[in-house]
Amino acid sequence: MSIKHSDVSIQYGYATVALGQMHYAQAGAADAPPLILMHAAGRSSSCYRHMLPLLAKDFRAIAIDLPGFGYSARMAANPTIDSLAHTLAELIDTLALQRPHIFGLHTGNKIAAALAANYPQRVGDVILAGQTHSLILDMKVRNAALAPYSDKYFPKYAHSSDGSHFLKAWNITQAAVEGFWWPSELLNAQGTRAEDLAQAEVRVIDHLHGWESIVPLYRAIFEFDLPEVVKRIQARTLVLELVTQQEAHYGPQGKLLCDLIPGAEHEQLQNAVGLSMEYRPDEIVTAIRRFLCRV
């Protein structure tokens, strides 16, 4: 299936891996350099819907739904970042991609790092992108910085014989959906745009598709040894730090991450937000193109 967007056709498909079928959206010529894009926890390939047409000029851009999210197969029990990286290596083989470039956002940057470290012959260049909190090297500090984003999803109750814990989990999901249904962009706007409603709709759908996988994925992130993994990356690497005023107290973290990867480069996007892929796609694409297309 394909949908026309800005005169560029976005195609949708599935690739079979051991877990089942992985869903993806792609744009660009089949013989263009492949570029895989991985999303954050709770999202799907839809977060790259504005970037794909822009990337299609230079790449075969492939935005995937991670296991348990979007339209991909369910996540395996007790996943690890390494196991998810293995699934991505399988997808690369299934699609017969030759050393695709890898772009990972937030959770995606952890999987991208593990993929590059564990399967160096499978990948081309690597871009690790995320807000400052997601690039912190110290595991305890990073996990504490993740708490404002993750705590609301973790249950504060025990399993019960009557199944009431399922209702409590569903109630947490409903509360999260309420926030995505009425984001600040809608509540505080002077005027409402069709794109604001479309953005809210995408966030709601993404959450409903992936709500059961968010906690297992965060647990995998909490256990992930980022410094150990990035030290093994051999690929040419860019760390793209999305700098926000709310996280200024952490100080720049991307350069510290770069120091562990031989030859890695650091770039910052100032005044960023978590939805920069959707609200400022041209700037993200410019950074990607500047790094990957450099001769």
Model-identified regions with their sequence ranges:
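Catalytic active-site module of serine/aspartate enzymes centered on a nucleophile-bearing elbow/loop
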Residues: 262-295
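Active-site loop/oxyanion-hole signature of alpha/beta-hydrolase fold enzymes
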Residues: 62-107, 118, 277-278, 286
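Conserved loop-alpha-helix segment in the C-terminal half of the alpha/beta-hydrolase fold
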Residues: 234-272
